[in-house]
Design a protein with these regions (language model features):
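N-terminal low-structure segments adjacent to metalloprotease catalytic domains
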Residues: 1-54
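Auxiliary, metal-adjacent structural segments of Zn-dependent hydrolase domains
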Residues: 43-106, 119
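Conserved binding/catalytic microenvironments
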Residues: 106, 113, 139
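Post-HExxH zinc-binding segment in Zn-dependent metallohydrolases
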Residues: 113, 146-185
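Active-site recognition of the HExxH zinc-binding catalytic motif
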Residues: 124-137, 157
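Inter-helical turn/loop segments and adjacent helix faces that build the functional surface
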Residues: 137-146, 165-171, 231, 235-236
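Pan-zinc metallopeptidase signature
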Residues: 190-252
Length: 252
């Protein structure tokens, strides 16, 4: 399935662009999709100049080449990919992710990029998000838990390190030592690992919001998967239940 040529929607306001996405969602409105995508890093501005520069940098073509390579390597599902300019004004997004991000579902993927992103950076965010797609297809559930979420993120960033390079892992992978993460697991994550993704506590723990350590769940998941990879391959872990992955580590 080809990369969707969202660059051809350049003249439209982001909210108008989201009307084109309605067929890809169940019971969704353009405004609902717009709010969801902007919450995860899409720019709320029209951004004609940004899109023009992205076209000049051949962002869409580069993503397509990288995607085909990755899909073949992992034997992953063929899904549509939508590319939009990212929010360059969000300070935390810029600090933690260099203003690049994405959003993955089992049947589609969104990337939020800017003209300055190099091919390796694009490969990193695509690898991260596409690993989510593969994991969600291998472990389909009606309700995902906090444990599922941290393992999902841990697998994704470990994939970046292994398939793109350690230098392209997100900054949050270096925030805490292994000892600190072990303490976080016992104090914050383990007691609430069964919390559903719809529960307000889920995102507070996953992202480390409020008084919780920044990027808490991501950091714990990264270390868990790092240990599990000493015993199993990445493609094997993608297929294992979250609980089984934890059992392969000292976090049990």
């Amino acid at each position: 399935m080809p990369i969707v040529r969202t660059d051809e929607w350049i003249e439209e306001h982001p909210l108008k662009r989201c009307e084109r996405l309605i067929p890809y969602f169940e019971q969704a409105t353009a405004r609902g999709i717009y709010l969801h995508l902007t919450h995860h890093g899409m720019s709320s501005e029209k951004g004609n100049e940004t899109v023009t520069l992205m076209k000049q940098k051949k962002i869409w073509e580069r993503v397509e080449t990288l995607y085909e390579q990755l899909r073949k390597r992992w034997n992953g599902p063929d899904i549509p990919i939508f590319i939009f300019p990212s929010n360059a004004h969000h300070q935390a997004f810029a600090h933690d992710f260099n203003s690049k991000g994405g959003l993955a579902y089992h049947d589609k993927l969104f990337l939020f990029l800017l003209p300055h992103h190099e091919t390796k950076e694009i490969a990193a965010v695509l690898t991260h998000e596409y690993s989510h797609v593969c994991r969600l297809n291998k472990q389909p559930k009606k309700t995902y838990t906090l444990l599922d979420g941290i393992i999902l993120e841990g697998l994704a960033e470990q994939a970046v390190g292994r398939f793109v390079g350690k230098a392209y892992e997100a900054k949050w992978t270096t925030y805490y030592s292994g000892e600190e993460v072990q303490k976080f697991w016992k104090k914050y994550i383990s007691p609430h690992q069964s919390v559903a993704s719809s529960h307000p506590l889920h995102d507070r723990l996953l992202y480390g919001r409020g008084w919780y350590p920044r990027m808490l769940g991501y950091a714990v998941g990264y270390r868990i998967v790092q240990q599990a990879l000493e015993k199993e391959s990445f493609l094997s872990l993608i297929e294992l239940p979250s609980e089984r992955i934890v059992q392969l580590t000292s976090f049990e």
